[in-house]
Swiss-Prot record:
Lineage: Bacteria, Pseudomonadati, Pseudomonadota, Gammaproteobacteria, Alteromonadales
Keywords of this entry: Cytoplasm, Ribosome biogenesis
Entry keyword annotation includes Ribonucleoprotein: no
Name of this protein: Ribosome maturation factor RimP
Alphabetized HAMAP family for the sequence: RimP (MF_01077)
Family annotation (Gene3D superfamilies): Ribosome maturation factor RimP, C-terminal domain, RimP-like superfamily, N-terminal
Any Pfam family matching the protein: RimP_N
Cited function: Required for maturation of 30S ribosomal subunits.
Family matches, as CDD domains: YlxS_C
Source species of the chain: Shewanella pealeana (strain ATCC 700345 / ANG-SQ1)
Similarity comment: Belongs to the RimP family.
Entry GO CC: cytosol
Gene: rimP
Origin: domain of life: Bacteria
Record localization: Cytoplasm
Amino acid sequence: MATLERKLVEMLKAPVEALGHKLWGLEYIQAGKHSILRLYIDNEKGIFIEDCAEASRQVSAVMDVEDPISTEYTLEVSSPGVDRPLFTAEQYQAYIGETVKVQLTMPVAGSRNLKGTVTGVDGQMLNLSVDGNELIVALDNIRKGNLIAKF
């Protein structure tokens, strides 16, 4: 996670939790005037559109005061959904035995895109079983990770 994203998580965690939700994670996608700050909120009872709207208002107010992003951006707030993005070691740990897809910054076993079963988490290292091979991936090498939904 980039430094700005870490700062944003720290800044926005309390306002989201004050609404009774958990800040699951966030993504900041820089693209000039089309940059996006995407927050994922979660709750044991589920997330509804009203929850997203309320969190958006709360987060917007904090962002206006703190102003950590000097350029234009669009704020999006949503639930993580069934193919939820994974951001932390704790989140990967919670999905041991489940299938995930990860996009890497640097290749592991010759690939930047891996799909496999989470077999463990050791500190900041993710253990994945990919096509019968056990791979170890540093969490800071994961650009994007998502749970693969089972239906």
